[in-house]
Amino acid sequence: MKKKVISAILCGAMVLGTVCPVLAADDKSEDTKTEAAAGDSAKGKKIALVGKAAGNAFFEIAAKSFQETVEAEGGEVQVVYPETATADAQIKVLDNLISQDFDAICISANDVNALQAKLEEAMDEGIKVSSFDSAPNKDSREIFVNQAGTKEVAQALMDAVLDISGGEGQFAILSATSQSANQNAWIDAMKTI
């Protein structure tokens, strides 16, 4: 129970870090930015949260906290999952969201580069684009919020391998998909430990 509470608090903080700066970027006034970041920047906004795929426990906790936080500030959230954990499926989701006049899209990307054209289209339409967990490239978003440092995750994973194996034998590293940016970064970092 304690872990769930801590996870929810961390997810809520991550949500605020993802949503508030992006929506506050509408107004260039420093005072307005500060006020928006303080809590009411989601008021009246329609925000989409796009996951990698349905059924991911981490994302479901994050989505719940995201929705609670935005709705508490007067915004509306639509949580959307692609049919499959692929960039092509996320592109279909993004097409649909762009046509629905969302104010902001926050995405956990299935591919670093494949979403660029569609996310740039969204930004050209005035939609604020942010990401968390797994980032598209820098040209495809306005902000990325990382839930944990790459090296720290890699170290924790390697510590778990050591604990389980007792320091002997071989182990395999599996990723959800070959294009999963965050997981591939963790794997690369694990190889250096």
Give the ranges of each region predicted by the language model:
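A residue-level marker of the well-folded mature domains of exported/periplasmic proteins
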Residues: 2-5, 9-10, 14, 21-193
